């Protein structure tokens, strides 16, 4: 089952409801704006912006929304953004890594700490749980764009891909690479004229914990509270249950 594998956290999924889609768009817009503010609006020299735009396109964000986010990042009076990662524990050995992009660190850490406290978790120090995860490059591409699966597999493995999965139900190929080979796999996808619908560096759990229904419900309330925070870009966990 997908929920019991390393693929569960990285899959690009279709059919999000309107509220979740709007929230996700907001996070994508913030990442585009932050990327431009940090390194300019030229995707040829700003890989962070390139990934952010790629992911926005993969989520079917309208071009005008993307352009507005780029223009906002180019404006001098737009606040500077900082990327920060928090680590903590939920109930029953669940480890959480929370990636944020914020223009106010004090606000963000206060809100993240409050979410952990309210839902029975505890915010830890840097390094408190990250050793339980591996930092990996991940890509999702439309299966319909792939003409020769064997050729794709050979080319990507040669470029440094560690694993490739064809998710026939969702209609995607999912690819995992090491942190070091992320750029070379991305370049090979360019050479193959395959544009990912999502591409990012993620935290993949080394081992996972199975939760009973009651505990899972409690932990998911914490994860959802964190994800509802506009400053939070992504929450990673080591739950084995299918959390979709």
Curated annotation (Swiss-Prot):
CC terms in the record's Gene Ontology section: cytoplasm
GO molecular function ontology, one term from the record: DNA binding
Localization, UniProt: Cytoplasm
Family matches, as SUPFAM superfamilies: YebC-like (SSF75625)
Coiled coil: none
This protein's UniProt keywords: Cytoplasm, DNA-binding, Transcription, Transcription regulation
Source domain of life: Bacteria
GO biological-process terms attached to the record: regulation of DNA-templated transcription
Alphabetized InterPro entries for the sequence: Integrase-like_N, TACO1_YebC-like_2nd/3rd_dom, TACO1_YebC_N, Transcrip_reg_TACO1-like, Transcrip_reg_TACO1-like_dom3, YebC-like
HAMAP family recorded: Transcrip_reg_TACO1 (MF_00693)
UniProt record similarity statement: Belongs to the TACO1 family.
Protein name according to UniProt: Probable transcriptional regulatory protein Aasi_0624
Biological classification of the source: Bacteria, Pseudomonadati, Bacteroidota, Cytophagia, Cytophagales
């Amino acid at each position: 089952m997908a929920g019991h594998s390393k693929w569960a956290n990285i899959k690009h999924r279709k059919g999000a409801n309107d509220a979740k889609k709007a929230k996700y768009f907001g996070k994508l817009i913030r990442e585009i704006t932050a990327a431009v503010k940090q390194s300019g609006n030229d995707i040829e020299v700003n890989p962070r912006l390139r990934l952010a735009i790629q992911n926005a396109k993969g989520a079917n964000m309208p071009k005008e929304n993307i352009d507005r986010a780029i223009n906002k990042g180019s404006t001098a009076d737009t606040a500077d953004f900082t990327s920060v990662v928090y680590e903590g524990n939920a109930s029953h050995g669940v480890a959480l890594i929370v990636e944020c992009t914020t223009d106010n660190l004090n606000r963000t850490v206060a809100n993240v700490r409050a979410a952990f406290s309210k839902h029975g978790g505890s915010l830890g120090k840097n390094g408190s749980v990250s050793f339980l995860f591996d930092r990996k490059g991940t890509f999702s591409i439309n299966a319909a764009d792939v003409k020769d699966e064997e050729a794709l597999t050979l080319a990507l493995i040669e470029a440094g891909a560690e694993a490739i999965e064809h998710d026939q139900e969702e209609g995607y190929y999912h690819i995992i690479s090491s942190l070091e080979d992320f750029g070379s796999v991305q370049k090979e996808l360019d050479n193959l004229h395959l544009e990912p619908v999502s591409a990012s560096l993620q935290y993949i759990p080394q081992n996972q914990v199975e939760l009973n229904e009651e505990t899972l419900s409690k932990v998911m309330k914490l994860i959802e509270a964190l994800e509802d925070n506009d400053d939070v870009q992504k929450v990673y966990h080591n739950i084995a249950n299918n959390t979709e």
